[in-house]
């Protein structure tokens, strides 16, 4: 299959620039993956589509305020750092701009000097390996000095950092939010549990590779970035129990979906596990664990659009996307949601 098979026209004004004030009042396009039938709802109506046998699988990762603005120690020249991946305790793979000022041995200062950094190596694709120096707790310093690493298509500044976190976020380590989860409120989750639906949590730390364009013409040649995941015993038991009782495993977001499909065996069973995944799901892939998916609307020609096409069929998805554009749904990270059932 070719990348151009996943293209669609998206007017720029449909790219949501800020989150909804009330998370669960975003719009919801419901797509039947077998028939292609479409319904238009509000996100909190998701409750009507869930049954007591179902299990929602949510990614509890938390976004690090991983964008740091600092200065070169010698010259005072302004620098921008974006933390990509923790290599060891105080060593990170980092994108540094401008790169020419970030040679090995270069030192940088942030805030009033409470955080310092040195480039100690070169990483993949122009990234740098950076060691940080500080007193106290790194996460607390980052919380004070760092900004949210919003996707490149969001041009407006975020007033409240928590609006780019899910209400159940817990495990710090992501460079981007698992955005399907942004639509849930504490109250909606409570109602879902009261209905008898099981909630199961796993972790996948979202890397910036999630925004990386597919640069090859033939999608099978694309290589995904690897991302760290973990699933505990309790979550594995809930999912396996759901399968045994004939319930649906509903992934909240493509990150939960990719983690489940990484861990699942050919019988659709999962187990406690952690590791790195570079799974790339595109049409032709047979889902082992995931029965349904709650997700946002994705970029044209993106790997995530290919993932949803593998679940619902390319024609059904491309038709639904064209309808969403026509009906002026909001797209991407802060946009509306889709439930593929």
Swiss-Prot record:
Localization, UniProt: Cytoplasm
GO cellular component: cytoplasm
Catalytic reaction(s) noted: 7-aminomethyl-7-carbaguanosine(34) in tRNA + S-adenosyl-L-methionine = epoxyqueuosine(34) in tRNA + adenine + L-methionine + 2 H(+)
InterPro entries: QueA, QueA_dom1, QueA_dom2, QueA_sf
Swiss-Prot/TrEMBL GO biological process terms: queuosine biosynthetic process; tRNA wobble guanine modification
Top EC group: transferase
Chain segments annotated as transmembrane: none
Record GO terms (molecular function): S-adenosylmethionine:tRNA ribosyltransferase-isomerase activity
UniProt keyword terms in alphabetical order: Cytoplasm, Queuosine biosynthesis, S-adenosyl-L-methionine, Transferase
UniProt keyword Transferase present: yes
The EC number(s) this enzyme carries: 2.4.99.17
Keyword flag Ribosomal protein: no
Pathway membership, UniProt: tRNA modification; tRNA-queuosine biosynthesis
Function: Transfers and isomerizes the ribose moiety from AdoMet to the 7-aminomethyl group of 7-deazaguanine (preQ1-tRNA) to give epoxyqueuosine (oQ-tRNA).
PANTHER family, per the entry: S-ADENOSYLMETHIONINE:TRNA RIBOSYLTRANSFERASE-ISOMERASE
Family assignment from sequence similarity: Belongs to the QueA family.
HAMAP family per record: QueA
Subunit annotation: Monomer.
Protein's name according to its UniProt entry: S-adenosylmethionine:tRNA ribosyltransferase-isomerase
Source species of the chain: Clostridium botulinum (strain Loch Maree / Type A3)
Gene behind the chain: queA
């Amino acid at each position: 299959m070719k990348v151009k098979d996943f293209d669609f026209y998206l007017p720029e004004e449909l790219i949501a620039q800020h989150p909804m004030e009330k998370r669960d009042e975003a719009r919801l396009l419901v797509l039947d993956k077998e028939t292609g039938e479409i319904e238009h709802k509000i996100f909190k109506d998701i409750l009507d589509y869930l049954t007591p046998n179902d299990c929602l699988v949510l990614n509890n990762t938390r976004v690090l305020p991983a964008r740091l603005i600092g200065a070169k120690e010698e010259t005072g020249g302004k620098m921008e750092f974006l933390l990509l991946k923790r290599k060891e305790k105080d060593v990170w793979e980092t994108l540094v701009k401008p790169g020419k000022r970030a040679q090995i041995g270069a030192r940088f200062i942030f805030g009033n000097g409470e955080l310092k950094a040195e480039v100690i190596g070169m990483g993949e694709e122009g990234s740098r390996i950076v060691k940080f120096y500080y007193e106290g707790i790194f996460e607390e310093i980052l919380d004070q000095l760092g900004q949210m690493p919003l996707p490149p298509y969001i041009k407006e500044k975020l007033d409240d950092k928590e609006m780019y976190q899910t209400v159940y976020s817990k495990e710090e380590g992501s460079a981007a939010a698992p955005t399907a989860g942004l639509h849930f409120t504490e109250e909606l989750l409570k109602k879902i549990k009261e209905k008898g639906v099981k909630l199961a949590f796993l972790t996948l730390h979202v890397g910036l590779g999630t925004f990386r364009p597919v640069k090859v013409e033939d999608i099978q040649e694309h290589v995904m970035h690897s991302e760290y995941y973990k699933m505990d015993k309790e979550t594995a038991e809930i999912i396996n129990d759901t399968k045994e009782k004939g319930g649906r495993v509903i992934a909240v977001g493509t990150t939960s979906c990719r983690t489940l499909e990484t861990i699942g065996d050919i019988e659709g069973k999962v187990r406690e596990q952690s590791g790195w995944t570079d799974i790339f799901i595109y049409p032709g892939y047979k889902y082992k664990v995931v029965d349904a998916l709650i997700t946002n609307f994705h970029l044209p020609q993106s790997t995530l659009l290919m993932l949803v096409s593998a679940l619902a069929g390319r024609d059904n998805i491309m038709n639904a996307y064209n309808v969403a554009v026509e009906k002026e749904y909001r797209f991407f990270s802060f946009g509306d949601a889709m439930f593929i059932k």
